[in-house]
Amino acid sequence: MRVRKILILGGTRDARQLAFRLIHAGHDVTTSFAGVTEHPVQPEGKVRVGGFGGVDGLRQYLKAENIDVLVDATHPFAAIISANAAAASGDVELLRLERPAWIAQPSDNWIHVADIAAAVSALPAKASVMLTIGRKEVAPFIARLDLSGVARMIEPTSVTLPANWSLILERPPFSLESEMAVLRDNNITHLVSKNAGGGETEMKLVAARSLQIPVVMIARPNKPTVTTYSSVEGINTHISKLGSPSG
């Protein structure tokens, strides 16, 4: 087996699993975090924290470190990072690890929207909302004074929540029982979610289905077309079949 120098753009559970797999396959792996989350779960192997300074900075890093393979395993909504990776990769093999999007079931009541602004507009007057969109984009919902509810995230938002909003700080995975309880206990009428996919947070959708609660589902942003796999195994197999490493 040829040892590869691999840079994983991480921050997801999938990225951690990939780092583990590639390291145990004998590769030289570094995982890079953007530094947005203050206390991320650490992967195996070497870790780099902080931005690269845009496309040029990432391109210089790939060259300086003699990276053979760049894997974009960031969140499906990390559009800027993915665009930078595509622009900077050059001759470096670029792969994307992206979990499949969730698909509405026949008994679901999903309201499909393109972005945060559309999600805010889609909520009816005086809705009791559960926000599961992370900490960065809470403000537009809070600005609608007729809305109330719960905002759940891993780390606190910089936005001050008014009295009619509650903050839940939790890290997934979540059970069906706990999701049902949150929706019921807070009298939630609408769930707002990004279509992140994956099993760690899927139970909120099952709970909403069971309670017949509408889901405002925000579509994934468009990303550059690159070779994409939905599983760690797919990435690992692809890398194992590559020719001689560069440099």
Give the predicted meaning of each segment.
Residues 59-116:
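Glycine/small-residue-rich loop that forms an oxyanion/phosphate-binding "nest" at active or ligand-binding sites
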Residues 20, 30-53, 108-109, 160-167:
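N-terminal beta-loop-helix "entrance" segment that forms/cooperates
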Residues 46-65, 169-178:
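Glycine-rich, highly charged phosphate/nucleotide-binding loops
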Residues 117-149:
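Internal active-site segments that recognize and position negatively charged phosphoryl groups
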Residues 142-173:
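Histidine/lysine/aspartate-rich catalytic loop segments that bind and position anionic ligands
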Residues 6-35:
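N-terminal basic/disordered segments at the start of proteins
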Residues 31-39, 97-103, 116, 135-138, ...:
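Short, polar loop motifs at secondary-structure junctions
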Residues 186, 195-207, 215-247:
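C-terminal functional extensions of proteins
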